[in-house]
């Protein structure tokens, strides 16, 4: 004789004729009404858990945003290391702040929230004026992985040279191969002007190191899951690869764009009927008026330009700026060499005329501020060779005569003397 309980719902106790359906299992039955009720309970608990998770994410997001340096703080930090370039530092401070604010926001975005797009940066300015150094200083402040790549070393896939994904390999290496950290890093691609296409019109032949590289960089700049060859060089199926999502990587591309001044001047001169001559007295005045059409005429393809919505100019460094570069930043060269000499118990000083002479030599090399170190090394290297071996030197003073090839003025611990540099 069959037990009546076999025809009852194990949860509500209703008999099979009281419900639409009764689902049987091993030693248990559940009616259709209890199934619906169970689904509602599960959905309620799921929504409650999601609400708690969303509240936790928002609390964490607020905490991260509170710890994120504000644009004014980023600017102040850059000001300690970079001389001049006020507009560029201001533009970069805002752009970097918005980028990492977007990165934090993206982690808690729902389908109904506005999606924040990434804004990569194009830096334009003469060689040796701090384009790469600005990006490097930003990364150091934010403590994020950073990599610098030379655009001239890149080629289109299938040709001799590095694939564009090698740019990301350097970032991954700086992140100690932590992919999560690398995906929030900063990449600076220098010499981007060197991959401009050779003509204003689309190429009918393969331009593997120019337009081809621009095309290859498009997806990476916009955001894609890129396969990075861990061995470097070209991608190969036999080599191990890592997948990196570039959606949250900030790209800062930089270039001198020599000759673009004429393109801008020509456009402004036509549109202002001669008034442009008053506006173009300085390179910065020209660069501040740059438009996408100028970049296109220079040789960047429209799709590439579109992925660099923030364009800012780096101004040329004159003699006065170079002296400030030598002496004022937190890690100025003069301060570095003074520190080196102090480790040997010797003080180092520079006459203002000596600094002017050093800057004059550096300007002749036409490589901007990066020439300052090599000039300083050539002057101080013979002195740094002899001073550590002598215990009678109290101080060294560099004069204009020292820069011209003479010896520095030395203060001895017991008497004064002159150090004559050997030929």
Curated annotation (Swiss-Prot):
Gene Ontology CC, one term: HslUV protease complex
PANTHER family associated with the record: ATP-DEPENDENT CLP PROTEASE ATP-BINDING SUBUNIT CLPX-LIKE, MITOCHONDRIAL, ATP-DEPENDENT CLP PROTEASE ATP-BINDING SUBUNIT CLPX-LIKE, MITOCHONDRIAL-RELATED
Domain (ClpX-type ZB): residue spans on this chain: 1-50
UniProt keywords, alphabetically: ATP-binding, Chaperone, Metal-binding, Nucleotide-binding, Zinc
Binding site for ATP: 126-133
Sequence positions that bind Zn(2+): 9, 12, 31, 34
Family of the protein in this entry: Belongs to the ClpX chaperone family.
Organism of provenance: Tropheryma whipplei (strain TW08/27)
Keyword Zinc among UniProt keywords: yes
Gene3D superfamilies listed in its UniProt record: 1.10.8.60, ClpX chaperone, C4-type zinc finger domain, P-loop containing nucleotide triphosphate hydrolases
Protein name per Swiss-Prot or TrEMBL: ATP-dependent Clp protease ATP-binding subunit ClpX
Main function: ATP-dependent specificity component of the Clp protease. It directs the protease to specific substrates. Can perform chaperone functions in the absence of ClpP.
